[in-house]
């Protein structure tokens, strides 16, 4: 019974940490070939995709000036941002962004 309770406590603690982290992937329909498909493979965070042509208010709110842009938030506040270069391709890798997410999680312990 003690082991079950400890497992539940660990699960609840880690679930609450993960739910506080969000990765937002901004892109546009006209830039679909440069979409960072691997964003959906990120773990331990919520993932949101925003098409700036369909959601200009979100583009403005997050001050997105180039696509794709990936923003990692914790508790709604921006922690890190990766933006495309002049060719509209993002240079960051899935590993770069996952490492940042992992660091955010570890900083809470």
Language model: regions and residue ranges:
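Soluble periplasmic/extracytoplasmic beta-strand elements of cell-envelope proteins
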Residues: 23-25, 69-71, 81
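Structural micro-motif
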Residues: 62-72
């Amino acid at each position: 019974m003690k082991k079950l309770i400890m497992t539940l406590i660990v699960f609840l603690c880690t679930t609450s940490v993960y739910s506080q982290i969000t990765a937002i992937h901004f892109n546009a329909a006209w830039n679909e070939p440069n979409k960072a498909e691997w964003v959906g493979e990120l773990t331990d965070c919520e993932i949101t995709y925003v098409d700036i042509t369909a959601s200009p208010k979100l583009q403005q709110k997050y001050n997105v000036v180039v696509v794709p842009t990936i923003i990692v938030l914790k508790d709604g506040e921006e922690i890190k941002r990766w933006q495309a270069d002049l060719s509209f391709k993002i240079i960051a890798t899935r590993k770069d962004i996952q490492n940042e997410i992992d660091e955010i999680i570890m900083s809470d312990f």
